[in-house]
Amino acid sequence: MKRITTFGDSIMGGIVLDQQNGQSAPRYTLLEESFSSRCASALGVEIKNHGRFGSTTRHGLRELDRWREQVTASDFVVTEFGGNDCDHCWKQIASDPEGEHRPIISLAHFKEQYRQMITTIRQLGSRPVMLSLPPIIADRYFDAFTRSMNSEQRGNVLRWLDNSVENITQWHEMYNLQLFKLSALLDVPIIDITTPFLVERNYREMFCDDGIHPNERGHRLIADTICHAATGYI
C-alpha cells in the first residue's frame, strides 16, 4: 500500500463551517468525508493528514521538520498552501485604512518557503506533489470577516478595497498563479483543483457560507479531480 503524507491549511485538513451553528461567531468542524478521506478510500492508499487551520508556508516548514521520519517513509508528500499566506489582517485595515498593508506572508517569502519545503521533501527521500488553490467567494468572505465589525470599520475595509469586495481575489489569484510557476520551475507535479470549480456554473454552491472553505460537495469535486490525476502517479 502506498503511503502519502499531506501538509496544508484547513482545506487540506477537511475543516468546514458548521452550517447548523446559530451563534454570531463562526464555528468549524471536521468533515468526515473530506477529500483526503475520499482519496484514501478510492485509491487504496494510506494518508497521514497534517492539514492545520490557519497554516501558512512558514508553518509548513515547521511541520515538515516535526514529521521528518514520516515523510521519509512516505511515497508521496502532497502540499496545499497559499490561502492563508495571501490573506490580510483585516482588523488592522479596519483601524487604519490609509496605512500600508501587506499579505500575512509576502509573495517573495511564500515562494522561498515553498521552495524550501519542496527541497526538504526531496532530501528526505519522498516525492512532492503540489495542489493549487480552490477559488474563493469574495462577497461571502467579506461578510464573514467583517461580521464582528461596526459599520465604520466595515466601511474602512471596503474603502481600502477600492469599494469592491472582488478585489480580495487579486492576492488569492496572484499566489495561486505562483504555485503553477513554482511547479514548472522546480519540476514538481501540480494537481489543478482550481479549474474544476470555475467550469461549474453553480460552483458557489460548493462552498461554505464563509466563502473560503469548500463544503461536502466541494470536497467531493476535489477528491474526484485528485483521483483522476493520481492515475499518473500511483
What are these language model-derived features?
Residues 1-51, 65-73, 77:
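Serine-esterase "nucleophile elbow" of acetyl-processing enzymes
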Residues 8, 14-16, 51-54, 82, ...:
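Glycine-centered flexibility sites
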